[in-house]
Design a protein with these regions (language model features):
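Rossmann-fold cofactor-recognition segment
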Residues: 44-56
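Residue(s) in the substrate-gating loop at a strand-loop-helix junction
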Residues: 129
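Active-site helix of classical SDR
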Residues: 109, 145-148
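Substrate-binding pocket helix/loop in short-chain dehydrogenase/reductase
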Residues: 85-86, 93-95
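C-terminal beta-strand-loop-alpha-helix "lid" module of Rossmann-like NAD(P)-dependent dehydrogenases
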Residues: 161-210
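A short, exposed helix-loop element centered on a Lys and neighboring polar residues
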Residues: 109-110, 154
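N-terminal Rossmann NAD(P)H-binding glycine-rich loop of SDR-like oxidoreductase domains
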Residues: 14, 22
Length: 271
């Protein structure tokens, strides 16, 4: 860690969980650089214009931050959600979802890791989701991006542990943020009679659950504890008791028993 204030780079810091993390860590004494496409800042932390979808933007952003000193920690929180049935989503829409949520994270990691190694170590938090552990109907490509992130984070943790870099996957359930309002709908959704009723019900359920979810500050508090822990966990879930119970049930129940419970919870009908 740096001899002065610990320095953290947070992606997706303009809103939602990323912004909450920036505010929380700044209040706790961290030197925060919050990256987003707009470079938004607030209350004393530094804003950085950086688009995780763009190789050169990420390279320039990380290089610029490193010019002022080492990066002690990374919180990779940039992401968004695509709604629609699998067959409704175009390949370009699906690729765009993975581009930000998965490949954007990879871009930042590949720029930050060499500097962390040279500095003797660091902490990395990858913002996953309960949707990276349980497939969410009508958000299949969002779930795919988070399932991919789970695999990446687990493998990465093994690779960099001998180098003094600790990796934690933080897995929030429903969180009350502007993620709900910014969810994108697949263009082919309009006029589709096959999935219309089920999609409308599923999105409505998502929105209600998110509106009643935990505040983003709860996730930020977990992120801070992970970054400041002497022995950070490999995974940390955040959410209401029912969501955490669902994750436990997936690990412990036979598949068919879990599937029946999940269908009921997700409002999925069967024939």
């Amino acid at each position: 860690m740096s001899s002065g204030a610990r320095r953290v780079l947070i992606t997706g810091a303009s809103a939602g969980i990323g912004r909450a993390c920036a505010e929380d860590l700044h209040a706790a004494g961290w030197a925060v650089t919050g990256a987003s496409r707009r470079g938004t800042t607030s209350g004393g932390w530094t804003g950085l214009v950086m688009d995780v979808d763009d190789d050169e933007s990420v390279r320039a952003g990380v290089t610029g931050m490193l010019a002022d000193g080492p990066i002690d920690a990374l919180v990779a929180s940039a992401g968004w959600g695509l709604a629609g049935a699998v067959e409704q989503c175009t390949i370009s829409e699906a690729k765009a979802q993975l581009e930000t949520n998965f490949w954007g994270c990879v871009r930042v990691l590949q720029q930050v890791l060499p500097a962390m190694r040279a500095h003797g170590g660091g902490r990395i938090v990858l913002m996953s989701s309960i949707g990276g552990l349980i497939g969410i109907p009508f958000q299949a490509f969002y779930s795919a991006s988070k399932f991919a992130l789970e695999g990446l984070g687990e493998a990465l943790a093994y690779e960099v542990a001998p180098l003094g870099v600790h990796v934690t996957l933080v897995e929030p359930g429903n969180v009350k943020t502007d993620f709900t309002a910014s969810r994108r709908m697949a263009r082919a959704v309009d006029g589709d009679a096959v999935y219309s009723a089920a999609l409308t019900a599923a999105v409505g359920l998502m929105e209600r659950d998110e509106e009643n979810g935990v505040p983003a500050a709860d996730v930020a508090a977990v992120v801070r504890r992970v970054l400041e822990s002497r022995r950070p966990p490999r995974r940390a879930s955040v959410g209401k008791a029912g969501e955490r119970a669902g994750l436990l049930a997936k690990r412990l129940l036979p598949f068919r028993a879990f599937e029946a419970a999940a269908k009921s919870s997700l409002g999925v009908s069967t024939r």
